[in-house]
Design a protein with these regions (language model features):
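Core SAM-dependent methyltransferase catalytic element
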Residues: 357, 371-400
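N-terminal accessory segments
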Residues: 1-157, 161, 170-171, 179
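A short SAM/SAH-binding and catalytic strip from SAM-dependent methyltransferases
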Residues: 273-286
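A short glycine-rich, Lys/Arg-flanked "PGG" loop and its adjoining helix->strand segment in the class I
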Residues: 288-299
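Short alpha-helix
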Residues: 238-240, 341-358
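Single conserved hydrophobic/aromatic residue that forms the stacking wall/gate
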Residues: 401-420
Length: 420
């Protein structure tokens, strides 16, 4: 292939990737703006099922309980929908590179939100409770508390130490790190999470200003009828006030959007610590994260980790492997390479790899945690999480140099936003 043909092929591939990125962003936005209608459909289902219920069976229930439930679902959907539309309206310039794409044809399936997109909206609302509601305080204490305490133990708060928080979600852990006097940058890949965290951090909300109803999607395992329709108010604190409480002048806080390995591909020995919570198992191949964190840490730097090994890219159906491999073992069109190359490791295997990379394990213990748990549900998932600190040995005689502004590489869809 000639150089001209190679350049043309690369340009075509980049254009296709950018177009797909725009369609993906449209699906995310559409899932936010279409959330209310999706929940209202559940209210209609309740009404239809109630209408078919035999009168003698309906008489066994509290008076009008099903009608009240349907009305409550609609009211909760409207409140959540208003919040999600505000998130979209407040995104500013945040989005794919090149600005907003031209409107897609309504029939174009690439621009239409899928059930997976709506599922991520529901997960984002649950994460609002975990990170930004008083109801999530106990879960934050169990998950974030040990990490924050360990950072203070192993990383000096000298005004120069910088901590990277990959898989930052809605950014509460990053904010708590910065509030303790560290420079902190969070990294997140999900547009759903990034849009919502941008709004919560930068919209100037007052404490407990917004009432969300995050558990309307959980009709099962309710102890009381009202539990499903209860409100959680966000944010429990004003982000800027939390940062100011850390003292030490202007806080060093930012969020970087994009896939972890790509965003930080060109950085080396740039961070004093990496604080990871429920993150390692998001990798198709966790060994790549181990190698990347080693490269990113300065000599003497610490990797503080808490989380399970619930690997995200384990194929659960044939649809995950749709397209598969060609005769030469290469992914075909339509196949998600992350499913195709995913490898899962036990803790003892991952521990061996961490030590083989060169880390020294200075803490290793198990902690019970939940993740976006509904505290009033009759069913919750309890994780027995590995909590460890791995230190990159300091080179003998090396004088460590603080890097206040490491070089960043942003691929498609990457951006940075800071707390106003």
């Amino acid at each position: 292939m000639s150089r001209h043909a190679e350049r043309a092929a690369r340009a075509a591939e980049e254009a296709a990737l950018e177009a797909e990125e725009h369609f993906h962003f449209e699906r995310v936005v559409g899932s936010f703006t279409g959330y209310e209608a999706a929940v209202a459909a559940d209210a209609r289902r309740t009404e239809r099922a109630a209408a078919r219920l035999a009168p003698e069976l309906r008489a066994l229930l509290p008076p009008d309980c099903l009608a009240r439930r349907a009305a409550g679902l609609r009211a909760a959907a409207a409140a959540n929908g208003a919040f999600l539309r505000a998130v979209v309206a407040g995104r500013g310039a945040f989005g794919p590179p090149g600005g907003a794409p031209p409107p897609a044809a309504p029939a174009d399936p690439r621009a239409r939100p899928t059930e997976a997109d709506f599922s991520k909206v529901r997960s984002t609302l649950h994460s609002c409770v975990r990170d930004w509601a008083a109801e999530g305080a106990a879960e934050r204490a169990a998950c974030y508390g040990p990490i924050l305490d360990e950072l203070e133990r192993v990383v000096p708060r000298d005004g120069r130490s910088r901590v990277l928080v990959p898989g930052a979600g809605l950014a509460r852990l990053v904010l708590e790190v910065a509030a303790r006097g560290y420079g902190a940058q969070g990294n997140e890949f999900s547009y759903h999470m990034l849009l919502c965290s941008n709004f919560l951090l930068n919209s100037g909300l007052r404490p407990n200003e917004v009432a969300l109803y995050p558990f309307v999607d959980q009709p099962s395992n309710c102890r009381r009828a009202g539990d499903r329709l209860r409100a959680a108010r966000v944010p429990d604190v004003v982000p800027a006030a939390l940062l100011r409480g850390g003292g030490g002048g202007e806080p060093d806080f930012s969020m970087a959007a994009g896939e972890f390995l790509d965003v930080y591909r060109d950085q080396r020995e740039a961070w004093d610590a990496v604080a990871a919570c429920f993150f390692v198992d998001t990798a198709p191949v966790a060994l790549e994260y181990v190698a990347a964190i080693w490269r990113l840490l300065k000599p003497g730097g610490a990797w503080v980790n808490l989380g399970p090994l619930l690997y995200h890219w384990v194929p659960t159906s044939g649809a995950d492997l749709e397209g598969g491999l060609d005769a030469r073992g290469r992914p075909t069109a339509g196949a998600d390479d992350r499913y195709l190359r995913a490898l899962e490791f036990s803790w003892d295997e991952l521990r061996h790899a961490i030590l083989a990379q060169g880390f020294e394990l200075v803490r290793e213990e198990w902690r019970h945690c939940t993740y976006t748990a509904n505290v009033r549900s009759m069913m919750r998932t309890d994780y027995d999480c590995i909590f460890f600190t791995a230190r990159k040995p300091a080179a003998e005689g090396l004088s460590l140099i603080h890097i206040s502004e490491p070089t960043r590489r942003y691929a498609i869809s990457y951006a940075v936003f800071c707390l106003k």
